[in-house]
Structures are given as structure tokens and as C-alpha cells.
Amino acid sequence: MSGGKYVDSEGHLYTLPIREQGNIYKPNNKAMAEDMNEKQVYDAHTKEIDLVNRDPKHLNDDVVKIDFEDVIAEPEGTHSFDGIWKASFTTFTVTKYWFYRLLSGIFGIPMALIWGVYFAILSFLHIWAVVPCIKSFLIEIQCISRVYSIYVHTFCDPLFEAIGKIFSNIRISTQKEI
């Protein structure tokens, strides 16, 4: 397995796929990572996507799983002909399937582009604007918090301590009259 090639059991020579070989910046195969005492790094931009399970985090479990039975139902005693029911089921299912494919074919790439730009802008603003503003605010507020702490310990603590001592001598007695 030298030079990014391997031999199968029948003696055929193959090159490893690019994803297993890594790139020029970080090796992504186990042999090179072990040789360099590094952990194997996977790039999020070149990872393979799962074409079978397209919702691995179950984002749409409660929302988009709409089947024929979820939309159209005939109660007991009010049934159409069996052929009509089967044709309606087939029409609904096939129409939903192909119309979704048509819409995703037309609008899928542009919407992916729009959402990619949107989340890139959000990430950029969070990294380069929001977090630095919050950090600078926390640094600047430390000065005010120290002055406020001195003010509270100097003026408010003695005042409220004195008020507490005044009210601590109040005794209440209750009597029940019949």
C-alpha cells in the first residue's frame, strides 16, 4: 500500500479514492496519519453524503411526513368503490412524489445557494461582529462593575444593615379574642 495504491486479492492494482488519501495540506488516510502521529482529520466540505438516509438528524419527522392516510380518510359506513380508493391513493402518492421532484429540481439548487449565503452571512456576523462586541462590552463593563461594587459596599451595605438592625427589635404578638 505504498504511493496511494493497493492490490486486491486477484492482483489488480488500484489507486485509493481521493477522500481516503487526503490532500496536500492534511493527510487523510490512516497510514499517513499514524506515521505522523496525528489523528485522522475529515474535511466537512469533501465528506460523502448519505443518499439513503437524507434526514440523519430527523429535522422533518413531525412536519413533512404526509401520507395518503394522513390527508384522506373514509369513516366506517362511508366508503367509495375499492377501485376509486386505490386510484386515489396511487394518484395522490405519485403526484406528490413527482411534483416534489419537479419543484426540488427547479428550485433546489437556487434555494440551496440562497440558504448557503444566508448561513454564511450569519456565521460571519456571529464570528466577526457579535462575539467581539460582547467580549468588548464585558471588558468595558468590568470598570463600571468595580465602581458599582465599591458604591454598594460603601453606602448601601451600611444603610441596609442599620435598617435591618432597627427592624430586628420589632416584636409582634398576636392574641385571639373570642
Curated annotation (Swiss-Prot):
Q: Give the position(s) of the covalent cross-link described as Glycyl lysine isopeptide (Lys-Gly) (interchain with G-Cter in ubiquitin).
A: K5, K26, K30, K39, K47, K57
Q: Where is it mainly found?
A: Golgi
Instruction: Summarize what the UniProt record says about post-translational modification.
Output: Phosphorylated at Tyr-14 by ABL1 in response to oxidative stress.
Residues with PTM Phosphoserine: S2, S9
One GO molecular-function annotation for this sequence? protein kinase binding
Record-level GO cellular component terms: caveola; endoplasmic reticulum; endosome; focal adhesion; Golgi membrane; membrane raft; perinuclear region of cytoplasm; protein-containing complex
The record's section on InterPro entries has: Caveolin (IPR001612), Caveolin_CS (IPR018361)
Renumbered residue ranges of the record's region Required for homooligomerization: 2-94
Residues where Phosphotyrosine occurs?
Y6, Y14, Y25
Q: Where on the tree of life does the source sit, at the highest rank?
A: Eukaryota
What are the start and end residues of every segment in region (Interacts with SPRY1, SPRY2, SPRY3 and SPRY4)? Answer: 131-142, 167-178
Topology Cytoplasmic: residue spans: 2-104, 126-178
PROSITE patterns, per the entry:
CAVEOLIN
Q: Which GO terms describe its biological process?
A: apoptotic signaling pathway; canonical Wnt signaling pathway; caveola assembly; caveolin-mediated endocytosis; cell differentiation; cellular response to exogenous dsRNA; cellular response to hyperoxia; cellular response to misfolded protein
Lipidation sites (S-palmitoyl cysteine): C133, C143, C156
Q: Does the keyword ATP-binding apply?
A: no
**Which stretches are intramembrane?**
105-125
Q: Which residues carry this modification: N-acetylserine?
A: S2
Per the record, residues carrying N6-acetyllysine are K5
Pfam families listed in its UniProt record: Caveolin
Q: According to the UniProt record, where is the region Interaction with CAVIN3?
A: 82-94
Its keywords, alphabetically, are: Acetylation, Cell membrane, Golgi apparatus, Isopeptide bond, Lipoprotein, Membrane, Palmitate, Phosphoprotein, Ubl conjugation
Its family remark reads: Belongs to the caveolin family.
PANTHER family (UniProt xref): CAVEOLIN, CAVEOLIN-1
Chain's role:
May act as a scaffolding protein within caveolar membranes. Forms a stable heterooligomeric complex with CAV2 that targets to lipid rafts and drives caveolae formation. Mediates the recruitment of CAVIN proteins (CAVIN1/2/3/4) to the caveolae. Interacts directly with G-protein alpha subunits and can functionally regulate their activity. Involved in the costimulatory signal essential for T-cell receptor (TCR)-mediated T-cell activation. Its binding to DPP4 induces T-cell proliferation and NF-kappa-B activation in a T-cell receptor/CD3-dependent manner.
Tell me what this protein is called. Answer: Caveolin-1
User: What lineage, starting at the top, does this entry show?
Assistant: Eukaryota, Metazoa, Chordata, Craniata, Vertebrata
